Amino acid sequence: VQCLKSIKIGKECSIAWNCTIIDSDLHGIFINNILSNPNSEIIIEDKVWVCSNTTITKGAYIEKNCIVGANSVVVKNKLKSNRIYSGSPIKEIKEFERWGQLN
């Protein structure tokens, strides 16, 4: 996790191994002395499951009760609640009611 602006992670989230969450490009690109790539907040709402090897970049907004599949890249996307997303670029796979861990 690399935070230069703001990263908000809700309650009961599950973030698997080898994930990257970064709200900055870690460098500035200036056009006519104006910063063209500012840092941007990341919001991950409650009960989101982020599977392994996923990258979430600046400007991402993941609504509650989402699943983000393994090896996905979330770039400035708004992911709607109660859905499974996967891929690079990220795509909606299906809608569902809820997810939970099995005992």
Residue ranges of model-derived segments:
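A glycine/serine/threonine-rich, flexible loop-to-helix segment
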Residues: 97-103
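Acidic, glycine-enriched loop/beta-strand segments at the rims
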Residues: 63
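Short-chain dehydrogenase/reductase
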Residues: 49, 67-68, 73, 84-86
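Flexible, glycine/small-residue-enriched loop-and-beta-strand segment within the central core
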Residues: 1-60, 77, 88-89, 95-97
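A short acidic/histidine/glycine-rich donor-binding loop in glycosyltransferase catalytic cores
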Residues: 83-84, 91
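Short arginine-rich
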Residues: 78-82
